[in-house]
Amino acid sequence: MVNELSFNCEDAWLNLFVGGEMYPVQVKTLMNPTTCGSYFRDVVKVSDAAIKVRGVQWDTAPNHIKFRVDIDRDGVLFRHVLQYLRNGKLTSLPDDIFTLESLVAEAEFFGLEKYREMLKKKLWKLTGKRQYYACYEDSD
């Protein structure tokens, strides 16, 4: 059963169940204004009274977190997405072209425009392909 749950603290934890992989994450990570994409802005709603998370289910995972949100995406790739949500610009990017291209699709799904630009910039540097050039604006 999918429902909405209210938290009174942004330090609360959720399990994100992505493509068969479990990712424990604090609600405040999903709310980070510098990295939060449109997907998580839709899932996490902040008001004066509470923080509401849509799509929460009771979790029977063997950790201390009792609530989870299911996301039908690639669970292995999501570890890179979560690293970006936690670290922003300091995120390390893989050097594998296939993984980078796959992450571009994940960034688009989650509405992470800055992450998408970082990935395309790295792809442009690795491949020199013009299709990635449009996002490359600075000189570093």
UniProtKB/Swiss-Prot annotation:
Pfam family for this entry, one: BTB_2
Domain of life from the UniProt record: Eukaryota
InterPro entries per record: SKP1/BTB/POZ_sf, T1-type_BTB
CDD domains in the cross-refs: BTB_POZ_KCTD-like
Gene3D superfamilies reported in the protein's UniProt record: Potassium Channel Kv1.1, Chain A
GO BP field: protein homooligomerization
Protein name as it appears in the record: Uncharacterized protein F47D12.3
Species for this entry: Caenorhabditis elegans
